[in-house]
UniProtKB/Swiss-Prot annotation:
EC id: 2.4.2.17
BP-aspect Gene Ontology terms: L-histidine biosynthetic process
Gene Ontology MF terms: ATP binding; ATP phosphoribosyltransferase activity
Major place of residence: cytoplasm
Domain notes: Lacks the C-terminal regulatory region which is replaced by HisZ.
Name of the protein in question: ATP phosphoribosyltransferase
Gene assigned in the entry: hisG
Length: 231
């Protein structure tokens, strides 16, 4: 079988991914010109490289259209309801670190934990005539964390199409769930992360689609071993 590996198409994610594969003995070159979205591994037959956006990689891995992909754990877990059953997080690659967090306005002085936020949510409708509004691009992770992990049910999700951190100030939401690397943007928008409000500590991962034909395939095993040895 031909093994397809999806790698980020641009930016630091592309550079870091290519560097790890090169350390693993798999030098990747573009097929055609430097802007091509296809590539190959020098000296290795039956391996195809496709360059996609990080979100596209998460989707293609989930559907089984590619065998391996390098993308953020947050994108995979947000995109797939049963991520661990459908894919294997085969290796954590040590770059692209960012946390998916719950952040509330700094002026909410007495709200520091998810339990505090649960109390606010329970009281919010009586006080304001509506449910607590959460702006996010991560609706699945938000629901799992609020309803599944903390038993908070009285909220509504507002889809964020732009800069999520600006939603409370604009009045489109009360709090946010967003991804952050340093927290500086949250602070600039007068938001604070709850003490137990880290939903996921994400980073770039080598992700493998769980396929029956991968079992006992020496090329699959070789790729896994090579990448892990390069970390």
């Amino acid at each position: 079988m031909t093994v397809t590996i999806a790698l980020p198409s641009k930016g630091r994610m592309k550079d870091e991914s290519s560097a790890i594969f090169e350390r693993a003995g798999m030098r990747i070159t573009a097929v055609g010109n430097d802007r091509s979205y296809r590539g190959r591994v020098e000296g290795v037959e039956d391996v195809e490289i496709t360059f996609l956006s990080a979100s596209e990689i998460a989707r293609e891995i989930g559907s089984g259209a590619v065998d391996f992909g390098v993308t953020g754990e947050d994108l995979v877990r947000e995109g797939l309801a049963d991520a661990d059953a459908r894919v294997e997080f085969a290796a954590r690659l040590g770059f692209g670190h960012a946390d998916v967090v719950v952040a509330v306005p700094e002026i909410w002085y007495d709200v520091d934990t998810m339990a505090d936020l649960g109390d606010v949510a329970a009281d919010f409708r009586a006080r304001h005539g509506r449910r607590l509004a959460i702006a996010t691009k991560y609706w699945r992770l938000t629901q799992q964390f609020f309803s599944g992990s903390h038993g908070i049910q009285l909220y509504r999700i507002v889809e964020s199409l732009g800069a999520t951190e600006g939603a409370p100030a604009s009045g489109s939401a009360d709090i946010i769930v967003d991804i952050t690397s340093t927290g500086s943007t949250l602070k600039a928008n007068h938001l604070k992360i709850l003490s137990d409000g880290v939903i996921l500590r994400s980073e770039a991962c080598l992700v493998r689609a769980r396929k029956a034909e991968h079992g006992g395939n020496p090329l699959i095993d070789r790729i896994l071993a090579a990448v892990r040895s390069a970390l």
